[in-house]
């Protein structure tokens, strides 16, 4: 088989396939990029893991335009391509190579959240349920029929990293369950294979398609004139990089809890005593209402207050509760701002 993937999300599937004894004839990943604090050229997590496993790696800048790479991949004669968050659309010349097809593990319940950031958008939109789907790939963006999926509930206090870890494990599991079915159906006429595999066309699943567009830096700005829930969703969905400003420095906000009585059962037990101490919307948005040394900063919003439990001030390390308050030298009545220049 040929494996396609780039971020750490895809590594558990690569590991699972390798550990299960499948012959992986090649791994395709994005080229090395500058990343990290040192802004150094670094291999993608998938490329690094593949090299550690002694697998052959290909890193096309744009597979659609690189006929020589396509020819080299074809020469490997892979029976199937497994794709997890590769990051490029595959052309028909690639999709048609393996006799058992190209199959993608997508981190949403299709047709909801087609595209590059389904995990982030499920959190930003306040979805209570998401999941993973194994989909037969077509030239369109995540439009193919679905072979298998698994639904999961999203917790109120679950951030993008935590949800990603859960879904990446499910992706690996679903591929291990699905590949034997795909192999048993064998190559042949697509319509007959689909019938045998009982794949479901997305238009038959129900629901209008939604698209997870690429996120920009502006999407990461916290506007305290929004509701506490909207701010909380932005913090969780864009973890760890949603940000506000503090004394002309960028303040990343990395863990929050909306102090809403209706959410009491979903809040941390230590946070619940804070409920009801402030009238919703009676204070200027962004104003610090309390510095709770063991919990963090209580900040006013358009609606109920929002508790900031973890943050990272520009030039500092991540900090919780009292340490965060000390780093900011925060006092009641001060204001967090909106970053205008990014």
Curated annotation (Swiss-Prot):
UniProt GO molecular function: methionyl-tRNA formyltransferase activity
A GO term from the CC aspect: cytosol
Keyword Phosphoprotein: no
Catalytic activity: L-methionyl-tRNA(fMet) + (6R)-10-formyltetrahydrofolate = N-formyl-L-methionyl-tRNA(fMet) + (6S)-5,6,7,8-tetrahydrofolate + H(+)
Residues given in the record as (6S)-5,6,7,8-tetrahydrofolate binding sites: 108-111
One Pfam family of this chain: Formyl_trans_C
EC numbers: 2.1.2.9
Keyword terms of this UniProt record: Protein biosynthesis, Transferase
Family: Belongs to the Fmt family.
NCBIfam families in alphabetical order: fmt (TIGR00460)
Chain's role: Attaches a formyl group to the free amino group of methionyl-tRNA(fMet). The formyl group appears to play a dual role in the initiator identity of N-formylmethionyl-tRNA by promoting its recognition by IF2 and preventing the misappropriation of this tRNA by the elongation apparatus.
HAMAP family noted in UniProt: Formyl_trans
Protein name, as recorded: Methionyl-tRNA formyltransferase
Organism: Prochlorococcus marinus (strain MIT 9303)
Gene name of the encoded protein: fmt
């Amino acid at each position: 088989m040929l494996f396609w993937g780039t971020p750490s999300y895809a590594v558990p599937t690569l590991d699972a396939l390798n550990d299960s004894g499948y012959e992986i004839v090649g791994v395709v990943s994005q080229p090395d990029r500058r990343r990290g604090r040192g802004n150094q050229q670094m291999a993608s997590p998938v490329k690094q893991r593949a090299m550690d496993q002694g697998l052959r790696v290909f890193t096309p800048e744009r597979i659609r335009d690189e006929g020589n790479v396509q020819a080299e991949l074809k020469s490997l004669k892979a029976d199937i391509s497994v794709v997890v968050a590769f990051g490029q659309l595959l052309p028909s010349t690639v999709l048609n190579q393996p006799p058992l097809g190209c199959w993608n593990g997508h981190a949403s319940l299709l047709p909801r959240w087609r595209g590059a950031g389904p995990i982030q958008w499920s959190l930003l939109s306040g979805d209570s349920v998401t999941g993973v789907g194994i989909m037969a790939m077509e030239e369109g963006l995540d439009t193919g029929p679905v072979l298998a999926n698994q639904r999961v509930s999203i917790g109120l206090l679950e951030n993008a990293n935590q949800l990603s870890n859960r879904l990446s494990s499910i992706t690996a599991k679903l591929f291990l369950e699905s590949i034997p079915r795909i192999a048993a159906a064998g190559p042949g006429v697509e319509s007959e294979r689909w019938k045998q595999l009982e794949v479901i066309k997305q238009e038959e699943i129900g629901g209008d398609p939604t698209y997870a567009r690429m996120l920009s830096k502006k999407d990461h700005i916290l506007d305290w004139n929004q509701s506490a829930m909207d701010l909380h969703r932005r913090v969780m969905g864009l973890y760890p990089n949603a940000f506000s400003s503090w004394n002309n420095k960028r303040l990343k906000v990395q863990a929050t809890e909306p102090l809403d009585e209706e959410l009491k059962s979903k809040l941390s037990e230590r946070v619940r005593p804070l409920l009801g101490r402030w009238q919703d919307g009676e204070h200027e948005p962004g104003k610090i209402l309390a510095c709770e040394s063991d919990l963090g900063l209580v900040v006013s919003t358009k609606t109920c207050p929002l508790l900031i439990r973890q943050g990272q001030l520009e030039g500092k390390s991540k900090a919780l509760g009292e340490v965060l308050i000390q780093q900011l030298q925060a006092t009641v009545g001060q204001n967090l701002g909106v970053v205008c220049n990014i």
